[in-house]
């Protein structure tokens, strides 16, 4: 199906031609697009402890960054930008915008960052290590891509940038820009987290002991016996592909440190919706909800996968699949909420 969001390309065509290959500019990708929030709303978010924010001020060729939360914040008349990350965690409209990109795996979706800039505002030329969609809100912004292409973005325009493309956006008037970012964990980051995960589940834990220790001729030299012991201990660490999949599911769904869920009451009517802070993924017979791994009876699995994919489903359908008790527990934890049909 052709998507106006992608300039008339199908999702398959976009992924083949542009994804992680070359930029795409779509004028009017979101017709009649209106800002998700106003400057006062964004300033209010930037004052909160559970929200990541920063202000960038351009001073000549320098860009000075301050990090929130900000007790008192007032926009300067020019060369000033406020950026707030994870707006989708706090604003329903931002979460809806993020879900428009569901033709990509949820495991890759990260967040919506909203920025408000006054005349001349920007963060300077830079390169991102991840894919990003830039959606222009009110006002206009001039983008220079790779130092060669200039794009004048107006409300509803979309720019896709693959990793490594140098870009620089400057506000031509007070404006909003919304960035859809994607998760791209580094190998070293995954490796360190995986070793922690293995350790929590129990690793061989024998303690080093000296065997036939002799007086040290060079007291600062590391004994060969200690090197041999460390090599043997590390060599005993074993894991399977199933272990990796389980770790990854828990890792990818783990809420960010600042996320707090509001406990609710169990309701058996209406439509069940995943809270916008919740992440429900699956792999094979295993499901992962907000950092926890679990399984369900085979007769329930297809229904739960559908809830994960669509993020909403009738409470009655979930109950018929034998998931009523699980959904009630999630309502009490604040992971899901019930809405009127």
Question: What residues fall within each predicted segment?
Answer:
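N-terminal auxiliary "cap/dimerization" subdomain that precedes the catalytic jelly-roll/cupin core
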Residues: 1-63, 285-341
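Generic recognition of stable, solvent-exposed alpha-helical segments in well-folded globular domains
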Residues: 154, 189-190, 225, 322-325
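Active-site region of the double-stranded beta-helix
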Residues: 1-17, 30-157, 165-207
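Long, charge-rich alpha-helical interaction segments
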Residues: 195-250
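Short acidic (Asp/Glu) and glycine-rich catalytic loops that position anionic groups and cofactors
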Residues: 22-23, 171-174, 203-214, 284
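Acidic, low-complexity/disordered tracts enriched in E/D and polar residues
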Residues: 234-307, 328, 339-341
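Proline-centered helix-kink/hinge sites
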Residues: 23, 162-163
């Amino acid at each position: 199906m052709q998507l106006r969001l992608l300039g008339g390309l199908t999702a398959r065509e976009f992924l083949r031609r542009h994804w992680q290959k070359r930029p795409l500019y779509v004028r009017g990708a979101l017709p009649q697009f209106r800002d998700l929030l106003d400057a006062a709303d964004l300033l209010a978010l930037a004052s909160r402890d559970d929200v990541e924010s920063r202000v960038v001020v351009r001073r000549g060729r320098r860009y000075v960054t301050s990090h929130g939360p900000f007790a008192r914040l007032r926009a300067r008349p020019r060369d000033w930008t406020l950026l707030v990350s994870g707006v989708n965690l706090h604003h329903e409209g931002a979460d809806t915008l993020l879900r428009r990109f569901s033709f990509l795996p949820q495991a890759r979706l990260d967040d919506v960052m909203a920025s408000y800039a006054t005349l001349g505002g920007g963060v300077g030329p830079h390169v991102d290590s991840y894919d990003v969609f830039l959606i222009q809100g009110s006002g206009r912004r001039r983008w220079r891509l790779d130092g060669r292409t200039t794009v004048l973005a107006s409300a509803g325009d979309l720019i896709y940038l693959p990793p490594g493309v140098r870009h620089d956006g400057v506000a031509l008037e007070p404006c909003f820009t919304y960035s859809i970012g994607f998760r791209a964990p580094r190998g070293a980051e995954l490796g360190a987290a995986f070793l922690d995960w293995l350790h929590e589940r129990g690793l061989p834990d024998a303690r080093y002991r000296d065997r036939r220790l002799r007086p040290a001729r060079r007291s600062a030299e590391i004994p060969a016996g200690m090197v041999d012991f460390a090599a043997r201990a590390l060599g005993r660490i074993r894991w399977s592909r199933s272990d990796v999949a389980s770790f990854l599911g828990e890792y990818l769904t783990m809420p960010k440190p600042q996320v707090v869920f509001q406990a609710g009451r169990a309701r058996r009517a209406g439509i069940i919706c995943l809270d916008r802070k919740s992440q429900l993924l699956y792999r094979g017979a295993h499901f992962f909800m907000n950092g926890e791994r679990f399984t369900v009876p085979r007769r329930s699995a297809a229904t739960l996968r559908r809830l994960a994919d669509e993020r909403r489903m009738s409470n009655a359908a979930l109950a018929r699949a034998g998931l009523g008790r699980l959904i009630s527990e999630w309502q009490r934890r604040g992971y899901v909420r019930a809405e009127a049909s």
